[in-house]
A protein has these predicted regions:
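Conserved acetyl-CoA-binding loop-helix of GNAT-fold acetyltransferases
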Residues: 85-98, 125
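A short helix-loop-beta-strand connector motif used in the catalytic cores of GNAT acetyltransferases and
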Residues: 40-52, 73
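Conserved beta-strand in the GNAT
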Residues: 52, 58-66, 73-78
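Conserved GNAT acetyl-CoA-binding A-motif
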Residues: 100-111
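A conserved beta-turn-beta hairpin within the catalytic core of GNAT-like acetyltransferases
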Residues: 66-75, 84, 130-132
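A short, internal acetyl-CoA/4′-phosphopantetheine-binding micro-motif in the GNAT/acyltransferase core
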Residues: 77-84, 112
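A short beta-loop-alpha structural element at the N-terminal edge
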Residues: 4-17
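Conserved beta-strand-loop-alpha-helix junction that forms the acyl-donor binding cleft
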Residues: 110-119, 138
């Protein structure tokens, strides 16, 4: 982590980011929102809240965060398996949360699959509280192909 730098994500990072996402277990994606075009739209709307951890030209981790002006959301967070347990994930979360604070966002939410034990443990250590008083619901407005890793 000596030469690791965290910087805002750019659409030119997409190929490396997508490859990292596909290498991580227990994550959910889809063919529209997580396509290069979908991520490009997302980054245009949220240019300052997603980050990559790089060392030289190697992608070590990524956090995809955005907000609607009221609430922040962390959509994906991944660290390459060989770089885990080095504080990279925590550093990415810290940077993302600071960017939300800078944009006057007061609350941040995220979703983690129930069976993703490592992910749930990580987010609990980051201070994210499990809400058991709400049901999460969604509706697809177009046909999406799920890509679960």
């Amino acid at each position: 982590m000596e030469n690791m730098q965290i910087r805002t994500m750019k659409v030119t990072d997409y190929e490396k980011v997508y490859a990292l996402w596909m290498s991580c277990k227990n994550m959910g994606f889809n063919d529209i929102d997580d396509s290069k075009e979908g991520i490009s739209r997302f980054l245009e709307r949220n240019p300052n809240t997603s980050f990559v951890a790089m060392e030289n030209d190697e992608l070590q981790g990524i956090i995809l965060g955005g907000h609607d002006g009221r609430r922040g959301y962390i959509y994906h967070m991944s660290v390459a398996e060989k770089h885990r347990k080095k504080g990279i994930g925590s550093s990415l979360v810290e940077k993302c949360l600071a960017s939300f604070k800078n944009e006057k966002i007061s609350k941040v939410a995220l979703l983690v699959f129930k069976y993703n034990e490592a992910g749930n443990s990580f987010w609990e250590k980051q201070g994210f509280i499990l809400r058991e008083d709400v049901n999460y619901r969604n509706i697809e407005l177009c046909e999406l192909v799920r890509i679960d890793t």
